[in-house]
Design a protein with these regions (language model features):
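Regulatory and interdomain segments flanking nucleotide-handling catalytic cores
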Residues: 3-275
Length: 275
């Protein structure tokens, strides 16, 4: 259809302010904020990592992939000013205190930026484009936080056991379908015994494979220089500690509890990781 303008016809100017407001009003989720006073956990997961890891890394575990995930977890902990970061398999969970107010607790920004940090860090380190998705979990008390991380560690153990059993069967010549069928609905004890029969002691495997890895801030002393007094002095700095020997069960619960009273010591802005 061709529009024809008659002589003398006036084209009314568009009200830019009105249009601006109309468009802003359609950003339905922009005003969403995380509940004030709640503990926050951001969890990022690798998108399509089942196929990605199958074609780029050894199975069931690959040290290079493990290091990439730890590097990504450290970037999230530092960039977003978290308290504790935990990674297992292709996921990372980062804990933030109730006082955390980065991005004014905007849900859209938290989800998009956390996914971006994870994707960019892994991609830059591995030189292959990958994507992470992100979600937000909220807790109202310390017990829920402890339960969350115990839940994720239990998932790490389950996935590690299933992974070792599956790939052992595949190496023995079973098809993907047959290996899955043989393990379906089998008990934890059955799978442990299956590995033992084939020379693999699950409990002797590297701890990070079945308990995950924790990252958190630690203080250390560093020699500095005081120009006013013209002498060297000892100063306290903080850096990220990578813990691949995490405890489990009740000891892990107490380990997590130890981080939950550190809110006042967390950075409000800037980067505190200093090697």
């Amino acid at each position: 259809m061709v529009l024809k303008f008659l002589p003398g016809m006036k084209i009314l100017p568009m009200d830019n302010n009105k249009l601006e407001q109309q468009m802003r009003d359609l950003e339905y989720f922009h005003s969403l904020r995380l509940l004030p006073g709640s503990w926050v956990i951001i969890r990022v997961d690798g998108r399509g990592f089942s196929q990605f890891t199958k074609s780029h890394f050894k199975k069931p575990f690959d040290v290079e992939f493990h290091k990439l995930m730890v590097q990504t977890a450290a970037a999230l902990l530092e960039e977003l000013h978290g308290i504790y970061s935990y990674t297992e398999s292709d996921e990372i969970s980062v804990l933030f205190p109730p006082s955390w107010d980065l991005f004014d607790r905007s849900l859209e920004k938290i989800v998009s930026i956390s996914a971006s940090i994870a994707s960019a860090t892994f991609t830059h380190a591995f030189q292959t484009v990958v994507n992470f998705d992100s979600r937000v979990w909220l807790g109202v008390n310390q017990s829920q936080i402890i339960d969350y991380f115990c839940w994720r560690q239990a998932n790490a153990r389950r996935c590690a056991l299933n992974g070792w059993c599956y790939w052992m069967l595949r190496k023995l010549g079973e098809t993907a379908r047959k290996a899955t069928t043989l393990l379906d609905s089998q008990s934890f004890a059955f799978k442990i015994d299956l590995l033992l029969q084939n020379g693999i002691d699950f409990n002797e495997l590297p701890t990070w494979q079945h308990r995950g890895v924790g990252l958190y801030w630690e203080e250390y002393q560093k020699t500095g220089y005081n120009p006013l007094e013209a002498k060297e002095v000892l100063v306290i700095r903080r850096r990220i500690k990578v813990d691949d020997q995490l405890p489990t069960q009740d000891e892990y619960s107490e380990f997590i509890r130890s981080f939950l009273n550190l809110e006042s010591n967390q950075p409000k802005n800037g980067h505190l990781s200093e090697q």
